[in-house]
């Protein structure tokens, strides 16, 4: 079991929350980005630097994450790929992507992108607030506790 973080756009506070949970539960983490994240390394946290380019980090995660892994991402197309493979994906606001909701979230994302392209909508999602951080930390704790119980040998 491993935690993968789509680290290019992941808020620093989310990476810190994941790092603390990783240390507590002894679950390895891999940050994937097109920038150097080696200073974030600990005994359980590593990073992979990919080439700059559209969806390169997403492709790396989708190809390397396994069904027993957790992927932290705000990228809905990546989450859809992970869920399709049988993996688990969580967004930085603590919302779990599931087979039941990922298609709807992908459609909504595409609609919003189209509205922004047409100039009918400005900006993106709101900045991560304290409520979002707390929701993420709680969701991560519940999810990791369950996953560790299921995937660690007794």
Swiss-Prot record:
Task: Give the top-rank taxon of the lineage listed in the UniProt record for this protein.
Answer: Bacteria
CDD domains per UniProt: PIN_YqxD-like (cd18720)
Which InterPro entries does this chain map to? Answer: UPF0178
**UniProt source species:** Geobacter sp. (strain M21)
State what protein this is by name.
UPF0178 protein GM21_2006
Q: Which NCBIfam families does UniProt cross-reference here? A: PRK00124.1
User: Can you tell me which family this protein belongs to?
Assistant: Belongs to the UPF0178 family.
